[in-house]
Regions:
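Nucleotide-activated sugar donor-binding and catalytic core shared by glycosyltransferases
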Residues: 1-304, 308-462
Length: 462
């Protein structure tokens, strides 16, 4: 499979694409939007489900993550062929505008010139989702929001003041902290972290016709915010389907060849990439030194150098230090690049004794493979995993406290729940519901007179 790189910054449309569109009798074009690696992994089961039903599926990649490790291998891994590469570039504000502009033109063409009704599937809380939905909505096409209403729940200022004051006095009680995080009343919902994703997910909701909620908690909060119940369905999370696919390929994983000193060891698997953690020096130094303390205390640590954490290590002058750690702690420390294949990631985290991350999707994956998770944030946009006792936040303020929280979590049996939260056959549930809605409504965009079915009362006579 070839994934074209468009060096002239133009939009790429695969050969014969428009011919194929013109020669199909299908009425709806199911447009799967992807960009980041988690996007691809979680949208892959939907793409495959629609393909298996012989629906007209169009895979649109924004093009911003065409680094081989971030995109190409995982596309090939799931058998996904890109139809349209929007090939966006430049800084983040330019990327926002380019997605809207280029997808807009594509949607107008597929609708006006080829008479296909676009049904865009946007995922999660990404820049791709919050721009693709605008291109659709402004052309009177509503979207299917996969993993809808992802909100961060953060313990209050009072809760954290109490935590840090007690820790400074030597009175930290891990068991009490772990239990206190189960109290739903301690949480606030106004965090802008992860940034800018918490803006993105909120900005998508008004363009959405079908909310594919990953857990019941989000169904309740969507209804609380005023969205109609009949447009919301708890379908669980497509990551569960993706993991089932990847488990079948783990036999071919070479992950432990890349990190041989972790094989058969009680290691922790670490990834850090969030902007607020890597672009804010104080926070990254706290996180880095928490990891360093774990290494120096002879905990087995596998730390993946993602693009953002690599940037931070260089930007804050830590490159020599991490190289010294690699040399001094060869037995218990591994540091290397991101794993290209999802099956390799699942192979490693399923054998880890804990996952330490600031990633939302990895919190879910840890829950599914029955491994304790420690989230290096102040709150979580996967609060359901905390309330299910399988995840604990380690706020990036005090390195020693963070390291202590991680040590308590390693292979903690209380944090292993073999009834994971995200079920199975999720993509089937989503496609079933979308096709049912299309059959009933024929399109996923309606003004109020249509939505309220008031057409029989129209009367423009004087």
């Amino acid at each position: 499979m070839q994934i074209p790189d468009c060096k002239d910054n133009s939009v790429f449309i695969r050969p014969n694409f428009w011919y194929d569109i013109q020669n199909t009798e299908k009425k709806y074009a199911h447009i799967i939007m992807i960009a980041t690696k988690p996007d691809i992994i979680k949208q892959a089961p939907l793409y495959l489900e629609l393909k298996n039903r012989w629906e007209l599926v169009v895979l649109v990649h924004t093009g911003q993550h065409y680094d081989y490790n971030l995109s190409k291998w995982v596309l090939a891994e799931f058998g996904m062929d890109v139809d349209v590469n929007l090939n966006i570039y430049w800084d983040i504000h330019k990327k926002y505008s380019l997605i809207v502009e280029r997808l807009w033109d594509f949607l107008v063409s597929i609708y006006n010139d080829y008479k296909k009704i676009p049904v865009p599937y946007v995922h999660w809380d990404t820049m791709t989702a919050t721009t693709a939905d605008k291109a659709a909505f402004l052309n009177k096409f509503a979207v299917v929001h996969v993993e809808a209403w992802i909100r961060t729940f953060t313990p209050s200022k009072k809760f954290y003041y109490n935590l840090f004051e007690k820790y400074e006095k030597g009175k930290f009680d891990w068991e009490k902290y772990y239990k206190d995080l189960q109290d739903f009343d301690i949480y606030e919902r106004w965090s802008i972290e992860p940034y800018p994703e918490q803006f993105d997910t909120r900005a998508i909701e008004w363009s959405t016709w079908f909310f594919a909620a990953p857990v019941k908690l989000y169904e309740k909060t969507l209804i609380f915010e005023g969205f109609p119940k009949e447009h919301i369905k708890v379908v669980w999370n497509t990551v569960a389907d993706a993991i089932e696919i990847s488990k079948q390929k783990m036999w071919n994983s070479t992950a432990f060849e890349k990190f041989p000193n972790m094989k058969w060891k009680p290691f922790i698997f670490i990834t850090i990439h969030r902007r607020e953690n890597t672009q804010k020096k104080e926070r990254f130094l706290v996180i880095y030194n928490a990891i360093k303390k774990l290494i120096e205390d002879w905990v087995y640590v596998c730390f993946l150098g993602l693009y953002a954490s690599e940037f931070a290590i260089d930007n804050y002058g830590l490159r020599k230090d991490i190289e010294k750690l690699k040399e001094k702690y060869k037995k218990n420390f591994a540091y290397g690049p991101a794993l290209a294949h999802h099956a390799e990631v699942i192979d490693m985290i399923s054998k880890a004794w804990a996952v330490v991350t600031d990633s939302g999707s990895m919190q879910e994956e840890a829950n599914i493979v029955w491994v304790p998770c420690v989230t290096f944030r102040f709150g979580s946009d996967r609060t359901e995993t905390i309330l299910a006792w399988t995840n604990i936040v380690a706020p990036p303020i005090n390195s020693r406290l963070m390291a202590e929280i991680v040590k308590w979590a390693i292979s903690n049996k209380k944090m292993i729940n073999k009834n994971h939260l995200y079920w199975e056959n999720v993509s089937k549930k989503i496609v079933d519901e979308v096709l049912r809605m299309l059959k009933k409504n024929w399109k996923l965009f309606k003004f109020d007179d249509e939505r309220l079915e008031l057409w029989r009362f129209f009367d423009w006579k004087i």
